[in-house]
């Protein structure tokens, strides 16, 4: 820009900036209130209430943005504010953020509002926050009544057992613990099993984030152990062993275990953060290498995560030279998928037209993606980032990809200043398609992949999700070896499905027919018919029948549906259930109801 205002002379500019910040502050207050309510719901064991709260919080941000846009249009005729005033609005906003506790999130809110009002030609750092303006380094809430981001404990003074007990009791959870000294003993034993004996350095200390992380039926204590130059992460899930009684379920001591519980295939945590950047910085120390965008998303600030991701993409494009290409693998009927090999994500666009047998619409597919966003994903469904008006340099697009885009999605394309602007797309983490993983893998890979696939579908089933198209190509294998579902255009609630057995053939002609001899309704599912599509490879068939022979029995599916209709919410664990204390150290527990279901070593990661 050639001219930037030297004098902030516009009263409207200040008023608009203040109005936008007031609306952001309202949004963040509601965000924090949800986390406080989550603690109460958790203490009372109100799991349906927690699910409702998590769903409502996901839509809250867009509601607040819409409200803010309406206020600006009604009171300030925002669409007709001239360019110089918009520049002053941004500068006033920056000034208002100098002592703010969530400046990075407030900047993102500003962008969201502006993108609803301004043409995309204004999406530059002159008018919106393409780059952050306010530093979040060393940001802390220093108000007397505020909780610190984390608390430091020194086991060398009072001993490790006493310190661990103080850490747990400081969260002041209302229900009593079944046997907290026993659980503390299990934590200490697990630490010894993992690290053996270690000498305590002068700086031996434990840092614990001041708020609990709530998700599903667990509340997580998250922290780090510091000893000499070592930083050891940990997370302790607290669960109800029976109504009104709590227990420490396990302790997770490996970075890869924490990476999974904070992973992109899980629903967002509810956690009360006065200074979110300080929480994210802390989490970065225990999960180095995990992008800040993913961490912000995992703690419920998905719009901030989305903003950071887009900045990461622009930065990567500035420091790379490879081209976007059509994604390897079997082409989908509904989605056009492409990727940048040097960037670990895929870009998915809904096609303009769908060939038979697909009978759906763009609006219906977008609603399916929203269903997944709102639903508890249990570590088995990939999160997606949804973007509008994405401009990609034409010079970075492979010619074959451009031809495919012009063929399949011409209605969503616009050429502008050397860029191809795509009206709407989704972005997901890139995974190895399960069909390729099974096709190219060793025998042990095949066993792992098939076992994970069956577990994934069964866990989705218990969570009221019917994948629809269950072919292996619609599932991916993450870098941690977990199988995750990522094709959502045929997804349905299991409770909306009619589970049926295949009727016996009426005669020999029926038996030899390649077509069903029975009527099939739009919501009918026939688990007995899945075998031919899933068991064609002899290696896969043998392993599948070894681990998941019940998969093709309609009774399995109907039982899950019946429990859901009765309001039952099953237990899920984002870690191997063999790590649960009641399984790992059974002698410490004796005969207790904590062991119910522990033998099913599911991985709901």
UniProtKB/Swiss-Prot annotation:
GO terms for biological process: glucose metabolic process; glyoxylate cycle; tricarboxylic acid cycle. The active site is at 383. The keyword Transferase applies. It comes from the Bacteria. Keywords: ATP-binding, Cytoplasm, Glyoxylate bypass, Hydrolase, Kinase, Nucleotide-binding, Protein phosphatase, Serine/threonine-protein kinase, Transferase, Tricarboxylic acid cycle. GO terms for cellular component: cytoplasm. ATP binds at residues 327-333, 348. GO terms for molecular function: [isocitrate dehydrogenase (NADP+)] kinase activity; AMP binding; ATP binding; phosphoprotein phosphatase activity; protein serine/threonine kinase activity. It is found in: Cytoplasm. Its main location: cytoplasm. Transmembrane segments: none annotated. Its EC number is 2.7.11.5, 3.1.3.-. It catalyses: L-seryl-[isocitrate dehydrogenase] + ATP = O-phospho-L-seryl-[isocitrate dehydrogenase] + ADP + H(+). Belongs to the AceK family. Bifunctional enzyme which can phosphorylate or dephosphorylate isocitrate dehydrogenase (IDH) on a specific serine residue. This is a regulatory mechanism which enables bacteria to bypass the Krebs cycle via the glyoxylate shunt in response to the source of carbon. When bacteria are grown on glucose, IDH is fully active and unphosphorylated, but when grown on acetate or ethanol, the activity of IDH declines drastically concomitant with its phosphorylation. PANTHER family: ISOCITRATE DEHYDROGENASE KINASE_PHOSPHATASE (PTHR39559:SF1), PTHR39559. This is Isocitrate dehydrogenase kinase/phosphatase. The gene is aceK.
